[in-house]
């Protein structure tokens, strides 16, 4: 798999739209999270970005064509002069790309308005370079609208969740989050719990009470 961050960085030629969020920046943030989740699913995944260059689309396509990828994905955000425009859509050209597009769309529409999958030529009349110049099956994800406050609020408060949904759609798998996933290896060690320090008779009595409650490994240690 290849995950490509769309556009160059601002203010270079080919940079993305700027609204409530900066598309070029968020393309890179989201794409890297998607790669992270795909690797968790065991998918061999490469990441690519082109930050400057008038031929950035050709550079992106060259990377996509450099291996026999099962799928190449480019991350984008949509924009409109109409501030009310909102929702998510995945764009494709090939029949194989259409299958992947629908799987990702089915995931993203749980968070954003469903604008349906679209063929870049038949539906959008756009002949997109990413889909025109790439050899492997390819899709282009328009995550949501940078020009819509509701869309961007949903996105910025759930970046990793959105990335997880995209990864699940691409891989056709579900990621089960481990509630203890942030526990470090050091936290898996055993630790002694020291309660108090007192005279021998009191300490002995406390030890016996603890043993009677099932705490067999209870010791008296002189201080």
Task: Say what each PLM segment does.
Residues 179-223:
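Solvent-exposed beta-strand motifs enriched in subsets of small alpha/beta binding domains
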Residues 1-2, 70, 138, 219:
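Hydrophobic "anchor" residues on beta-strands that sit immediately upstream
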Residues 3, 139-141, 193:
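Short beta-strand motif preference
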Residues 11, 21-180:
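Active-site-proximal helix/loop segments of hydrolytic enzymes
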Residues 1-20:
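Short glycine-rich His-centered loop
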Residues 6, 50, 223:
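Acidic/polar N-terminal loop/beta-strand segments that form early-domain functional surfaces
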């Amino acid at each position: 798999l290849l995950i490509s961050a769309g556009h160059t960085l601002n203010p270079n030629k080919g940079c993305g739209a700027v609204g409530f969020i900066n598309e070029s920046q968020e393309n890179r943030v989201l794409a890297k999270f998607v790669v992270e989740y795909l690797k968790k699913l065991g998918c061999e995944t490469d990441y690519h970005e082109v930050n400057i260059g008038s031929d950035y689309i050709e550079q992106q396509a060259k990377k996509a064509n450099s291996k026999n990828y099962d799928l190449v994905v480019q991350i984008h955000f949509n924009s409109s002069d109409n501030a009310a425009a909102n929702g998510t859509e995945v764009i494709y050209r090939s029949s194989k790309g259409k299958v992947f597009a629908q799987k990702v769309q089915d995931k993203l529409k749980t968070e954003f308005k469903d604008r349906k999958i679209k063929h870049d030529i038949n539906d959008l009349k756009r002949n997109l370079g990413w889909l025109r110049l790439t050899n492997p099956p390819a899709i282009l994800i328009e995550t949501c609208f940078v020009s819509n406050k509701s869309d961007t609020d949903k996105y910025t408060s759930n970046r990793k969740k959105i990335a997880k949904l995209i990864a699940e759609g691409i891989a056709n798998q579900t990621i089960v989050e481990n509630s203890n996933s942030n526990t470090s290896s050091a936290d898996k060690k055993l630790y002694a719990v020291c309660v108090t320090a007192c005279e021998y008779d009191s300490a002995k009595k406390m030890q016996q009470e603890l043993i009677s409650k099932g705490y067999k490994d209870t010791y008296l240690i002189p201080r």
